[in-house]
Amino acid sequence: MKTLQIIKQDQDKIISLVEHETTHTKYIQKELNYYDKTLYQTLQKIKSPYLPKIFVIQENDNHLILIEEYIKGKTLDQQSFSKDEVKDIMHQLCECLDSLHKLNPPIIHRDIKPENIIYHDNKVTLLDFGIARFLDSKKSKDTLILGSVGYAAPEQFGFQQSNPQTDIYALGKLMNYLLNGSLEHQNNIPLDLKQIILKATQLDYKNRYNSVKEMDLAIQQKLVIIPPLNNDTFKSKMISLAWIVFTLMIVADMEPGETIKNSFINKLSCFLFIYFGLFLYYNKNLFHKHMSKVPWPILYSIILFIFVCLDVWFFMWIDFLI
């Protein structure tokens, strides 16, 4: 391996960008002075899209040498994000941590912060397991005070043992930072997301979410917008409500000579058609996230056309039954 760059060096580790001399493939090489070999062997076996692959684990003169996958992209502290992007990042991190927490015993990362997370092409990668550890049910508290100030949970300062809720605390702090650019202030955060952050960052770990899956569910429930019920802002709620009222006013009157039955069916069909367009508009980022390469103007037209066809067929069938 040829060393291209020393990324980080301190008394605990040396992290380098290296290149294979034959294939010219780039890797990350880590030389660790303090380590848990079993933990890295466990990480090597985990098949997760959110963790860098570990190709080599080798002990050499009281050092542990790791050769890991090189991940391109910037860390979270080098970027800014919309609310929808933050929700997506948190969703991916919850899935990543769930794969660690469901192990027996669970692995606790203990150092979740923007500098340890790469976000590239809408994909999250969690890095730096330098202070990660297995949960030890026999211990009542951590023996060493480790973690990053601002993201470390109270139990990391020697009050109790680190546990899965320790990572949940850091996720809450991270979410606050990504939404507002600060660890403390919550000025511009919507109420529903603020409540998630407050629950995740409770001082007593027993009052936090029971698992990252539970926290993810709380976030996921806000990913799909049902206008005007759960729009992110008061302004968008009012716009949605006004649009719905306006639509109802347009379709309210019966045409001369039209029966009540046919009028109801036609007007309801018209309203559902327009509301479906409103639903697509407010959830466009969610659809774009999962299908980023789709030509959306064409797809929207196709979806609306299919909806109209189904809509007409459905109400003709109801009309026949009535």
Please tell me what each predicted stretch does.
Residues 101-119:
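Catalytic-loop of the protein kinase fold
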Residues 141-155:
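Conserved activation segment of eukaryotic-like protein kinases, specifically the C-terminal portion
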Residues 61-75:
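Conserved short submotifs of the Hanks-type protein kinase catalytic core
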Residues 3-41:
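ATP-binding glycine-rich loop module of kinase domains
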Residues 167:
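Conserved catalytic-loop aspartate of Hanks-type protein kinases
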Residues 208:
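Conserved HRD-motif arginine in the catalytic loop of eukaryotic-like protein kinases
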Residues 47-57:
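Conserved HxN/HPN-centered segment at the entrance to the catalytic loop
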